[in-house]
UniProtKB/Swiss-Prot annotation:
Protein name: Probable helicase with zinc finger domain
Similarity remark: Belongs to the DNA2/NAM7 helicase family.
Residue ranges, compositional bias (Pro residues): 1760-1769, 1783-1794
Gene: helz
Cellular localisation: Nucleus
Organism placement in taxonomy: Eukaryota, Metazoa, Chordata, Craniata, Vertebrata
Organism this protein belongs to: Danio rerio (Zebrafish)
Residue spans of biased composition, Low complexity class: 1107-1116, 1641-1660, 1847-1860
Motif annotated as DEAA box, chain positions: 787-790
Keyword Iron-sulfur: no
Length: 1860
C-alpha cells in the first residue's frame, strides 16, 4: 500500500498541471516526495522522485515561484550526479515515451523562452535551461527511433500518401481509378485508389502531424525561442513593440551592404553589426529567424565591451543559429558596444535571406535583414530588349470591313474547296452543343456527332489563338531565295510574283503555344501596307481598305517566306530588293480540320473503333511460326509475338492490334519486319501511315529500299507526298519512290491505277485522305499499319480507316505514355478530343488482352534510366537490353539543386528561373570538359536541355550562345519527341513560390482531368507524359536542375519526383542539398510553420532594375531610433529600372492561361512601425513560403499594357483572368495590404540579375498598399505614415479625405514626388470613367480655406445642401514637422489610375527639382497607382463621394502635394529630409449622423461595376452603417441574401468566436472593404449643367500649416479624345443593388496615365470589424487577432452636437511615436491574416443590415452590446484579402454601428485574443462548399453558345469559358 501512494500522488499532480491547478499540483508533488521519504531509492522510486520533482518545478514556474523551482532543479541534478551512469537520461526517455513529460516540457520552454518580460530574466536560469536541454536530448533520441519505425509500427496497409499536403482534406480520390479500375499514375498517383486508402492517408497525416507537433514543441530552446518570438509578433496587440528594426538608445552600423550579390556559385560573405547602446543594455540573445535558409547563415562571432576594449564572447565553433549571453557585461560606463559577425556561405545558385534578431532584454527586440543573391555575373541585357514585333489584337479582317484580294491562282483542288464549304462552323447553339457533346463518354452511337462538334469547338479556340497574332513587320522583297542543307535549293518567283521574307522573333517560335499554331496550322496571311499616305490618295472616301492574301512558301527556324501575288505587286508598285512595312494577319488553315470532319463522315463501320472485348481473340501460335528462320534474328520474344499477331491469317478476325512500346523498344523495326512477312501472303496489300514525314521516309530509307535492292521488286513502295511540298526538300533516295511531274518538279497525286500497281503504299495520316478520294473500294488494303499512333488525335488516325473493312488487319503502334497531341480548347480537352485512338483502345482492352502487346526491351538508354521509367510509367515491364556507357562522375540519374524563384514576365504566360539558367549553363560547361571517350564525339545533339516553358528556353539558349556553346540543343519538351541525346538536362523552373495547390471546389476537377490546365501550367510538376517524354530522350544521363522541395510537394507528379530524388540520394548524385534537409523542410511545410513565410510581404525587386540609384544608406550609416526621417530600411534603394529598359509588348500572350504571379503584399513600413522578421519569399525555401494555409489558388491578374486603341474592347471580360486594363481587374483577387508587415523586400534587397524577380518593372514595382488603398508613387504606402497610437478611428477614415480631395482646375497631370513626369506618360490612355468627369456639384461648393476644412455635413434627403457650419480643424503636429518644401494636394482620383502630378511645382525647392530632373529621360516608364476598380464596394464609393469637399484651386493643390512629400519625412533620392507628414483631420464624424441620406447619384457614380454585377446578388459593404440604415426600403432591396448563397462559416476559430463572443451592432467600427484611389485631375472646363446624372465632386482638403503657397503647375501633356478607349461606364461590370450606370459622356475627359502594374490595396478601415470576414480558402483556417486592449470610444466627434467646435488635431510629438505617454492605443478588432485560397470571382463580402433588423436581433438574442473599440491605427492596416473572405454574418449577427447608434460604453474592456495564431493553424479546417455561381456551369446549350459567341475568352490563351 505504501508503494501506491507516491504513484497516485504523481498521477494527481500531472492531472492538476493539465487542468492548470498549479497549487494543487505543487501539493500533490510534495505529497509524493514525502511519501517516498529519505530512504535509499530503488530505480523505480528514483524515477518516481524525478517525476514528482519535475511536476513541482513546472507548477512552481507557472506560479512564478522561480527560486523554489530552481531549488527543486538542484535536487534533480543532485540525483543525476550521484548516480552518474546515464540512468537519468534513460529515465527521462521512458517518461517521454509514456507521455508523462509533455506538460513539463511545454511549461519549461514557455517559461524560459516564451515570455521574456515576466520577471524571470532577473533570475539565474542556468539549471532550468540545462534541465530543458536534457529533456530535449532524450526526446530527440525517442523521436528518431520512432520515426524509423513509423511505417512498421503503425502497420499501414496502403501506399504512403503524397507529401507537401498541409491539410488532410487535400487528399482526394482518384476518379479515373474508381471509374475505370485503371490509373496511369499507378502507385505514384497522388489521389487515393479507394475510400479505405483515403481514410488511411488521413489517419497517417493526423498521426504524423501529432508527431511533428510533439517534435516541434520539444525542439531545442533556440527554435522555440524563435517560434515563440514570431508567434508573439503575429499575435501581438502592438507588433512593433515585439520586433522592430530600430530600438530606442541603440544605434546599429553594419560593415557592408545588407543586400549583396556574389557572382560565383561557391561563395561566402560576412557582415559585422556594431550595436552602440546608451544607456547600457545587456545583449541576451542573438537568433537567426528565417528557417528556410538556416544552413547558409550562422552567427560567427560576438564581442562585447565599450569604446576602449571589446571582449570576445564564447560562440560554438563553426558558428551557431542562436547565441545566448553567458554573463551580463558590467563595464560601469554609461554605454556599451557589441559587435556581431554573421557568416554566409553557399554552394548553389539562388537567393538567400535571413533576419537577425538582437534581444537586448526588453522589447521590442532589434532586427536586421540580410540578403545574398548568388548569380552569374553574365548580364542578361539581351533578355530585356523589347521584342521587335508589335503584337496587336485588332478586328479580324474579312469581307465586311476590308476588300480582300485573294491570291491567284488559287491552288486548292476542287475537293478541298468543297470541304471548306461543306464544313462551316455552325452558328446556332443546338447545332454546336448537341447532347453528344454533353455526354460524358464517347460511344459507338454518339461517335460522329460528338467528334464533329468538338472539332468545331477546337477550331474556334485555334481561331481565337491565331487572332492574337497581328504583327507589324518589315518585309524584304526578293525575286528568289535559297535554302541550304539537305533540303537546300533555290526558288525563283515567276509571273510577276515576288517573295517576301520576314524574321521570326521568340514570339513566333514553335516554343510558344500560339507560335506553334502559326508554324503548324497557318499557310497564308493577309497583309495591309502601312504607308497610308500613298494609299489614301487614290482611294475614294468610305471605300474599304484593300488587304492582300499571300501564301506562306517556306518556314525556317528564323524566317518565314511569303509568296506575294501579281495583283498585289502591281497595285502597290512593289519591286524586288526593297522593304515594305505591313501589318500581317495570319489565316488559320481550316483544311486539316475539314479533312478530319471528312474522315469522320467516311468511316462506315464504327465496330472497328469499338471492338467487342467480351470475346478474347485467339492468335494461333506454333513453334514453326515462333522460330521461323526467316524472322530477323535481332527480333526479341515480344517483337516476334507482335509479328505473329500482325501476320495472323485474315480469316481470323482480330480487333485492332496495339503494339505499345516506349521510345527505343523497336516499334518501327517490328512493323517493318512485319511488312516483309505480310508481303509473302498472296493478295496482301499494305498501307503504312505515320504521323510525320520523317518517320514515313524512315521506312523507305532504312527498311524497304534495302529490301527492294536485295531483289524483292514486289515490295517496291509508293510514297505519297503532299502535292505542294517542294521536291528539293525530300531526300533523293525517297524521291525514287514518289510520283513527280517531269515539267513542274512537283509531286503528283496518285491515281487509282498507281495505287493498284503497288503492294506497299507509304503515306502520312494527312496525305492518306488523298487515297480516300480515289474511289478505292474499302478493303483494298489487307493491312493498315499506323505508326506514331499516340501522337495523333483520334480524328486524324481514322482517316486511313475509311479504307478498312471488318476483315482488314489494323495495327496501331506507339507509346501511350508519351505526349498527347495538343488541343487548344479546354472544353474539348476535357472531353478527350486530344486522346489518341491508341490511348483509348489501350484503356478499352483488358490488361492481359492478346491484341495489346507491350514491347519491353529498350535498346537506347542506360539501365538506371530504364528502371526508373519502367517502375513509374510502364508497370515495371521494361528491361534494358542495350549497353549504354555511364559517366564516371555522374550517376545516370542526377539532381542539381538550384533554389531560385520562378518568375512570369509581364506579358508572358511562361515562367523562367534564372538560378536554374546559371546552374544549367555551368553544368553543361562542366559536362563538355568531362566528356567521356566512350560516349563518342561531342557533336550537335549530344547534349540536350529541355524545359516546359518558352521563356526558360530562350534564356538558357541565349546564355549558352554567349559562352559559345550553340551546339547544345535547347528545346521545349513538346518539340523533342523522336529525338535522342546522350545527356539530357531538365530545367523544372517552378517553385512553391508560384505553384499553389488548386484546392477550390471549382478546381478540384483539375486533379482528375488529365492534360488539364494545371498539367500545362505546372509542366514537369504535374504532367507525367511530359516528364516521361523528356526522361526517355536521354541515353546515358538525365540531369535535373530544380527545387527539390517544390518538386516533392506540388503537382500530381510529386511522388515521381520523390522517387527520383531518393534514387539520386542513394547513389550519391543529389547535389546542393541533403535528403535529410529535404525531409525536414517538407515536414516544416506540412506543419504549416508560422514563420516560414510572411504572407504579407511584397514582391521582391531585383537589383538589376535599380542599378543606377545609390543606396540611401551605405555601410557605416547609422540607423537612429526612433527614426526621425526614415522610411525605408538602410539598405534599400529605389526600384527604378535601368536606362533603356523597354517594355516588352504583349507578344507572349499565347499559351497557357496566365497563372498566379507572385502575390504582392506590403512595402516599406512607416517609421515606428514594426517590420516583419519574416522574409519575403526566398528561392531556397520556396517550398516553405506558402503553407497552403495561406491559400490554394491565388490567381494574380497582371496588367498587360497594350499600346493601341481598341485593344481594350477586343476581349470580353472574364474577371477571373482579365489581366490588362485597370477596368478589368478583378480586385477581389487582391491580397490585402499588410499591417505594415515589416519592411520587406519590395524595395530593398535587390537581385542584380533578375533572380526571383518579376522581370518587368512595370508590373513589379510593388509598393505596399496602404490601409485605405492608396499608394504614393514614390514607392511608399500611405499607411506607412506615422500611424501613432493617439489617432482614433475617425482619423483613419478621415484619411480618405484626400481620396477625392480637390478638383484640379488645371489640365496638368499632377505628379507625386518621386517620378519625373516624363516617365509617367503612356501611349495607351484609358478613358476616364464617367464619375470622374463630373463637374463640381452645386451642393458641395469648394472650400476656400487652405488650412481649414469643414468637419461635418448634414445632408437633407433629396437635395444636397450644406446644413452645418464649417469648423476649422487645426493641425496637431509640432511646427518642426512642417519643414521642407510645400507640395500641392492631390486631385481627384480615378478608378483607373492615379495620375502623377508634376514634380516641378513652383513651390518646390531648387535642389529637389534638380534631383527629379536628374533622372535619365529614357528610363522605363514607371507604374502609377492602380486603383481599386473592377468590383468595388459600396463603402468605398460612399467614402469617396462623401469623405471630403472641394477646396480652392492651386494653393490647395500645392499644400496637398507638400503634404504628400512631407508625410514621409525621410531621405530618399527624391525627398529632402524633414518634409512634413500629412495631417489626417477627423472628418468622417458626420457619417453617423441620423437623417443622412445618400443620394442615388452618389451611389451610382464611379462604381467599378458594370451590368454583370446585376446578375449576381452581392452583399454590400457596411462602411457607414449608420448612414445606410437611413436608406429607404426600396433602396435596400438587395440587402438580404438568400441563405443558400450565404457562404457558410468555415473555420473552427470563427465558429468559436461566434459562440463565445456574441456581437452587437455597436461592437466595432465598421469595415470598409476597399477605398479606391480615384486620383486624377479634373479638366479645366466649364461645369456641366446636368447634375442629375453626375455625383458631386467637391472634396475636402486636409489642413496644412500656414504660410505655404505655390503657383500653378505647368501644363505638359494632354491626349486627344480619339485616344480614349473606354466608351462608357465599364466594360462588362454592372452596379449592384439595382443601381444604373450613368449615361455615357461625350465630353473629353482629363488625362489619365496608364497604370502599368497592379496595386493591391485595402483600406485601414477595413479592419474595424473583422468578425464578418471569413477566409474563403477551401477548408483553410482563419487567423484572427485582436489588436489592442483598451478602448476609447470610437467616434467621439460623432456623439457631439453638430455645431460644437471640433478640437484641433495635431500630430503627437516624436517621443510618443513608439509608445511614450499619451492616450492608450484603442483596440482595433480582430485581424485577418489573408488566405490565398480564393475563389476566382468573389462576390462582395459584406451585407447591409438595417438598423431595425439590428435592433430586433439584439432584442431576440438579449445581447449586451460590448464597447465599440476604435482601431489601433498602428496596426490597423487592412489585412482583409479581397475576394478571399466571404462575409461571416450569421443570421443572428448584424454589422457594427460606427458609434452613431449611441452604444457607447466605458473604455478599457479588452477582449483577449481567443486563439493564438498557432492554434488557428492547428484548427482542423472545414471543407468549403462551392459558391452557387461556381457550382456548375450552365448546361443550357443556347446559353453556352451565347457565351461562346460573346467570346468569353481567357484574354490570353484563346480558351472559352465553356471551353475550359
Amino acid at each position: 500500500m505504501e508503494d501506491r501512494r507516491p504513484q497516485k500522488s504523481c498521477d494527481e499532480a500531472i492531472g492538476s498541471l493539465v487542468r492548470q491547478e498549479y497549487e494543487a499540483a505543487v501539493a500533490h508533488s510534495t505529497e509524493a516526495l514525502l511519501a517516498m521519504g529519505p530512504r535509499t531509492p530503488t530505480p523505480s522510486t528514483a524515477l518516481l522522485r524525478t517525476r514528482a520533482l519535475l511536476y513541482r518545478i513546472a507548477a512552481r514556474l507557472q506560479l512564478k515561484d522561480y527560486d523554489q523551482a530552481d531549488e527543486d532543479c538542484k535536487h534533480v541534478f543532485a540525483e543525476e550526479l550521484a548516480k552518474g551512469d546515464g540512468s537519468f537520461r534513460a529515465g527521462l526517455q521512458s517518461l517521454l515515451l509514456d507521455g508523462s513529460l509533455q506538460e513539463v516540457c511545454s511549461v519549461l520552454s514557455k517559461a524560459l523562452y516564451g515570455e521574456p518580460l515576466n520577471g524571470i530574466m532577473t533570475k539565474d536560469m542556468t539549471r532550468l535551461k540545462r534541465l530543458l536541454s536534457e529533456i530535449e536530448a532524450a526526446r530527440s533520441k525517442v523521436v528518431f527511433s520512432e520515426e524509423n519505425e513509423e511505417d512498421v509500427q503503425e502497420g499501414w496497409q496502403f501506399r504512403p500518401p503524397p507529401r507537401g499536403v498541409t491539410s488532410s482534406e487535400e487528399y482526394t480520390l482518384c476518379k479515373r481509378f474508381l471509374e475505370q479500375g485503371l490509373c496511369r499514375y499507378g502507385a505514384q498517383c497522388t489521389s487515393a485508389h479507394s475510400q479505405e486508402e483515403l481514410t488511411e492517408w488521413q489517419r497517417r497525416y493526423a498521426s504524423r502531424l501529432i508527431r511533428l507537433k510533439q517534435q516541434q514543441e520539444g525542439k531545442h530552446f533556440s527554435e522555440n525561442y524563435m517560434e515563440a518570438l514570431i508567434e508573439k509578433w503575429i499575435n501581438s496587440l502592438t507588433p512593433e513593440r515585439v520586433m522592430n528594426d530600430c530600438v530606442d538608445g541603440v544605434t546599429v552600423e553594419h560593415s557592408s551592404d545588407l543586400s549583396i550579390t556574389v557572382n560565383t556559385k561557391k561563395s561566402s560573405h560576412s557582415w559585422t553589426f556594431t550595436l552602440f547602446c546608451k544607456p547600457v543594455r545587456t545583449l541576451q540573445r542573438i537568433a537567426l529567424l528565417y528557417d528556410a535558409n538556416r544552413p547558409h547563415f550562422s552567427i560567427a562571432a560576438v564581442s562585447a565591451g565599450d569604446a576602449s576594449a571589446l571582449e570576445p564572447q564564447p560562440v560554438c565553433p563553426g558558428g551557431c543559429q542562436e547565441w545566448s549571453a553567458a554573463s551580463p557585461v558590467q563595464n560601469g560606463m554609461d554605454h556599451c558596444i557589441y559587435t556581431v559577425e554573421i557568416a554566409f556561405s553557399t554552394e548553389i545558385f539562388g537567393t538567400f535571406r535571413q533576419t537577425v534578431v538582437f534581444d537586448l532584454g526588453c522589447e521590442p527586440v532589434l532586427m536586421q535583414r540580410v540578403m545574398v543573391d548568388a548569380a552569374s555575373i553574365e548580364d542578361l541585357e539581351h533578355l530585356l530588349q523589347a521584342r521587335q514585333q508589335l503584337l496587336m489584337t485588332a478586328k479580324r479582317w474579312d469581307s465586311s470591313c476590308k476588300t480582300i484580294v485573294e491570291f491567284v491562282p488559287n491552288e486548292n483542288m476542287d475537293l478541298e474547296r468543297s470541304l471548306l464549304t461543306r464544313y462551316q462552323i455552325p452558328l446556332s447553339a443546338d447545332q454546336l452543343f448537341t447532347q453528344s457533346v454533353l455526354d460524358k463518354t464517347l460511344t459507338r452511337d454518339n461517335y460522329q456527332p460528338r467528334l464533329h462538334d468538338l472539332l468545331y469547338i477546337e477550331e474556334i479556340a485555334q481561331y481565337k489563338e491565331v487572332t492574337k497574332f497581328n504583327i507589324k513587320v518589315n518585309l524584304q522583297l526578293v525575286t528568289s531565295f535559297m535554302l541550304t542543307g539537305i533540303s537546300g535549293g533555290a526558288k525563283y518567283a515567276q509571273n510577276g510574283q515576288l517573295f517576301a521574307r520576314f524574321k521570326l522573333t521568340e514570339t513566333l517560335s514553335e516554343d510558344t503555344l500560339a507560335g506553334r499554331l502559326v508554324m503548324t496550322k497557318v499557310n497564308s496571311v493577309l497583309l495591309l501596307p502601312v504607308f497610308k499616305e500613298r494609299m489614301g490618295q487614290n482611294q475614294p472616301a468610305g471605300a474599304k481598305e484593300r488587304v492582300y492574301e499571300a501564301l506562306i512558301e517556306e518556314k525556317t527556324k528564323d524566317y518565314i517566306f511569303l509568296r506575294v501575288c501579281k495583283e498585289c505587286c502591281d497595285e502597290l508598285g512593289l519591286v524586288a530588293d526593297q522593304e515594305l512595312q505591313v501589318e500581317l494577319q495570319f489565316q488559320l488553315n481550316r483544311l486539316p480540320l475539314c479533312e478530319m470532319h471528312y474522315a469522320l463522315d467516311r468511316v462506315r463501320d464504327n465496330s472497328i473503333l469499338f471492338p467487342d472485348i467480351s470475346l478474347t481473340p485467339t492468335i494461333p501460335w506454333s513453334p514453326n511460326r515462333q522460330w521461323d528462320e526467316q524472322l530477323d534474328p535481332r527480333l526479341n520474344a515480344k517483337q516476334k509475338e507482335a509479328i505473329l499477331a500482325i501476320t495472323t491469317p485474315l480469316s481470323i478476325n482480330l480487333p485492332p492490334v496495339l503494339i505499345i512500346g516506349p521510345y527505343g523498344t523497336g516499334k518501327t523495326f517490328t512493323l517493318a519486319q512485319a511488312v516483309k512477312h505480310i508481303l509473302k501472303q498472296p493478295e496482301s496489300r499494305v498501307l503504312i501511315c505515320t504521323h510525320s514525314n520523317s518517320a514515313a521516309d524512315l521506312y523507305i530509307k532504312d527498311y524497304l529500299h534495302p529490301y527492294v535492292e536485295a531483289g524483292n521488286p514486289h515490295a517496291r513502295p509508293l510514297r505519297v507526298y503532299f502535292r505542294n511540298r517542294w521536291v528539293k526538300t525530300v531526300h533523293p533516295l525517297v524521291q525514287q519512290y514518289c510520283l513527280i511531274s517531269g515539267a513542274h518538279f512537283t509531286f503528283q497525286m496518285p491515281t487509282r491505277q498507281d495505287v493498284e500497281r503497288h503492294r506497299v503504299v507509304v503515306v502520312t495520316l494527312s496525305t492518306s485522305q488523298y487515297l480516300c478520294q480515289l474511289d478505292l473500294e474499302p478493303g483494298i488494303f489487307t493491312h493498315i499499319l499506323l505508326d506514331e499512333a499516340a501522337q495523333a488525335m483520334e480524328c486524324e488516325t481514322i482517316m486511313p480507316l475509311a479504307l478498312a473493312v471488318k476483315s482488314t488487319r489494323v495495327v496501331l503502334a506507339g507509346d501511350h505514355m508519351q505526349l498527347s497531341p495538343f488541343v487548344y480548347s479546354e472544353f474539348a480537352r476535357e472531353r478527350n478530343l486530344h486522346v489518341s485512338l491508341l490511348d483509348r483502345l489501350y484503356e478499352h482492352y483488358p490488361s492481359e488482352y492478346p491484341c495489346r502487346i507491350l514491347l519491353c526491351e529498350n535498346y537506347r538508354s542506360h539501365e538506371a534510366i530504364i528502371n526508373y521509367t519502367s517502375d513509374l510509367f510502364y508497370e515495371g515491364k521494361l528491361m534494358a537490353s542495350g549497353k549504354q556507357p555511364p559517366h564516371k562522375d555522374f550517376y545516370p540519374l542526377t539532381f542539381f539543386t538550384a533554389r531560385g524563384e520562378d518568375v512570369q514576365e509581364k506579358n508572358s504566360t511562361a515562367y523562367y528561373n534564372n538560378a536554374e539558367v546559371f546552374e544549367i549553363v555551368e553544368r553543361v560547361e562542366e559536362m563538355r570538359k568531362k566528356w567521356p571517350v566512350s560516349w563518342g564525339k561531342l557533336e550537335e545533339g549530344s547534349i540536350g536541355v529541355v524545359s516546359p516553358y518558352a521563356d526558360q528556353v530562350f534564356r538558357i539558349r541565349a546564355e549558352l550562345r554567349k559562352k559559345r556553346m550553340s551546339e547544345v540543343s535547347v528545346e521545349r519538351v513538346l518539340n523533342v519527341q523522336g529525338k535522342q541525346f546522350r545527356v539530357l538536362f531538365l530545367s523544372t523552373v517552378r517553385t512553391r513560390h508560384t505553384c499553389k495547390h488548386k484546392q477550390t471546389a471549382i478546381k478540384r476537377k483539375e486533379q482528375l482531368v488529365e492534360d488539364s490546365t494545371e498539367d500545362l501550367d505546372y509542366g514537369f510538376l504535374s504532367n507525367y507524359k511530359l516528364l516521361n517524354t523528356a526522361i526517355t530522350r536521354a541515353q546515358s544521363l538525365v540531369a535535373v536542375v530544380g527545387d527539390p522541395i517544390a518538386l516533392c510537394s506540388v503537382g500530381r507528379c510529386r511522388k515521381f519526383w520523390e522517387t527520383f530524388i531518393s534514387i539520386c540520394h542513394e547513389n550519391h548524385s543529389l547535389h546542393g542539398i541533403t535528403f535529410e534537409q529535404i525531409k525536414i523542410q517538407l515536414e516544416a511545410l506540412e506543419l504549416k510553420k508560422t514563420y516560414v513565410l510572411n504572407p504579407l510581404a511584397p514582391e521582391f525587386i531585383p537589383r538589376a532594375l535599380r542599378s543606377q540609384h545609390p543606396p540611401q544608406q551605405g555601410p557605416g550609416k547609422h540607423q537612429h531610433s526612433p527614426p526621425k526621417a526614415k522610411g525605408q530600411l538602410a539598405n534599400h534603394t529605389e526600384p527604378f529600372p535601368p536606362e533603356g529598359f523597354v517594355q516588352p509588348n504583349a507578344a507572349v500572350l499565347m499559351g497557357n492561361p496566365i497563372q498566379a504571379f507572385t502575390p504582392p503584399g506590403a512595402g516599406a513600413p512607416a517609421s515606428g512601425k514594426s517590420p516583419s522578421p519574416v522574409q519575403r519569399l526566398d528561392p531556397g525555401a520556396s517550398i516553405l513560403y506558402v503553407p497552403a494555409v495561406y491559400g490554394g489558388n491565388m490567381v494574380m491578374p497582371m496588367p498587360l499594357p497594350l499600346p493601341w486603341a481598341g485593344y481594350q474592347s477586343r476581349f470580353p471580360m472574364d474577371p477571373r483572368i482579365m489581366s490588362h486594363q485597370a477596368a478589368m481587374y478583378n480586385l477581389n483577387l487582391r491580397p490585402a495590404a499588410s499591417r505594415t508587415s515589416p519592411v520587406l523586400y519590395g524595395f530593398s534587397h535587390a537581385s542584380p540579375l533578375g533572380l526571383n524577380q518579376q522581370q518587368n518593372t512595370e508590373k513589379e514595382l510593388l509598393q505596399e498598399p496602404s490601409g485605405n488603398g492608396k499608394m504614393d508613387i514614390n514607392g511608399k504606402a500611405e499607411h506607412c505614415r506615422l500611424l501613432t497610437p493617439e489617432r482614433k478611428a475617425p482619423e483613419l477614415k478621415e484619411k480618405q479625405g484626400d481620396l477625392e480631395s480637390v478638383q484640379n482646375k488645371s489640365p496638368e497631370p499632377q505628379s507625386n514626388m518621386g517620378f519625373p513626369a516624363n516617365r509617367l506618360i503612356r501611349k495607351d490612355p484609358q478613358r476616364a470613367l464617367n464619375f470622374h468627369m463630373a463637374p463640381p456639384h452645386p451642393a458641395f461648393p469648394s472650400h476656400h480655406g487652405t488650412s481649414q476644412f469643414p468637419q461635418q455635413y448634414g445632408l437633407s434627403r433629396p437635395p444636397l445642401r450644406m446644413q452645418t457650419p464649417m469648423h476649422p480643424q487645426a493641425s496637431s503636429f509640432p511646427p518642426s514637422f512642417y519643414s521642407g518644401p510645400p507640395m500641392g494636394p492631390r486631385g481627384l482620383q480615378s478608378p483607373v489610375l492615379e495620375g502623377g502630378e508634376d514634380p516641378m511645382g513652383a513651390g518646390m525647392s531648387e535642389d529637389l527639382k534638380g534631383v527629379v530632373r536628374g533622372l535619365p529621360a529614357q528610363m522605363h516608364q514607371q507604374p502609377l497607382r492602380l486603383n481599386s476598380f473592377g468590383e468595388e464596394s459600396l463603402d468605398s464609393l460612399l467614402g469617396d463621394t462623401l469623405d471630403g469637399q472641394a477646396s480652392s484651386g492651386m494653393d490647395a493643390l500645392q499644400h496637398q502635394q507638400q503634404a504628400r512629400v512631407g508625410q514621409w519625412g525621410e531621405h530618399t533620392p527624391f525627398l529632402p529630409a524633414g518634409v512634413a507628414p500629412f495631417p489626417l483631420p477627423q472628418q468622417l464624424a458626420h457619417l453617423a449622423q441620423p437623417g443622412l441620406r445618400i443620394p442615388p447619384q452618389i451611389l451610382r457614380a464611379g462604381w467599378g461595376l458594370g451590368p454583370a454585377a446585376d446578375e449576381e446578388p452581392r452583399p454590400t459593404m457596411p462602411r457607414y452603417p449608420g448612414l445606410l440604415r437611413e436608406m429607404l426600403p426600396q433602396d435596400q432591396q438587395y440587402e438580404q441574401r438568400d441563405p443558400a448563397e450565404m457562404p457558410p462559416p468555415q473555420s473552427r476559430l470563427l465558429q468559436y468566436r461566434q459562440q463565445i463572443q456574441p456581437r452587437s451592432p455597436g461592437d466595432l467600427p465598421s469595415p470598409s472593404s476597399s477605398a479606391p484611389n480615384h486620383n486624377f485631375p479634373a479638366p479645366a472646363q466649364p461645369s456641366y449643367p446636368d447634375t442629375s446624372r453626375e455625383p458631386p465632386v467637391g472634396f475636402s482638403q486636409a489642413p496644412f500649416p500656414p504660410d505655404h503657397s505655390a503657383g500653378p503647375l505647368p501644363v505638359k501633356y494632354l491626349l486627344q479624345e480619339a485616344h480614349w478607349p473606354h466608351p462608357g461606364h465599364m466594360l462588362g461590370h454592372g452596379l449592384p443593388f439595382g443601381l444604373q450606370a450613368m449615361a455615357q459622356r461625350q465630353d473629353p475627359g482629363p488625362l489619365q496615365h496608364q497604370q502599368q502594374k497592379q496595386q493591391l490595396q485595402a483600406p485601414q478601415s477595413s479592419l474595424h470589424s473583422l468578425d464578418e470576414y471569413e477566409p474563403r480558402g477551401p477548408g483553410r483556417p482563419l487567423y484572427q487577432r485582436r489588436i489592442s486592449s483598451s478602448s476609447p470610444q470610437p467616434y467621439p466627434d460623432s456623439l457631439e452636437p453638430q455645431d460644437q467646435p471640433v478640437p484641433s488635431y495635431r500630430y503627437p510629438s516624436a517621443d510618443l511615436w513608439l509608445g511614450g505617454p499619451g492616450p492608450v492605443p484603442g483596440p482595433a478588432p480582430i485581424h485577418n491574416i489573408p488566405c490565398n485560397g480564393a475563389s476566382h470571382i468573389g462576390p462582395h463580402r459584406e451585407i447591409l443590415v438595417s438598423k431595425a433588423m439590428s435592433e430586433e436581433q439584439m432584442k431576440a438574442e438579449c445581447l449586451q452590446p460590448p464597447p465599440p473599440p476604435p482601431p489601433h491605427p498602428a496596426s490597423a492596416a487592412s489585412l482583409q484579402h479581397h475576394g478571399q473572405f466571404p462575409p461571416l454574418l450569421p443570421s443572428k449577427q448584424t454589422p457594427p454601428d460606427p458609434g452613431g447608434g449611441g452604444n457607447t460604453s466605458p473604455a478599457g474592456h479588452p477582449k483577449p485574443p481567443t486563439m493564438s495564431y498557432a492554434s488557428a493553424l492547428r484548427a482542423p479546417p472545414k471543407p468549403r462548399p462551392m459558391l452557387p455561381e461556381q457550382s456548375k456551369k450552365n448546361s443550357d446549350p443556347i446559353s453556352l453558345l451565347q457565351e461562346l459567341s460573346i467570346g468569353s475568352s481567357n484574354s490570353s490563351n484563346g480558351y472559352y469559358t465553356y471551353f475550359k
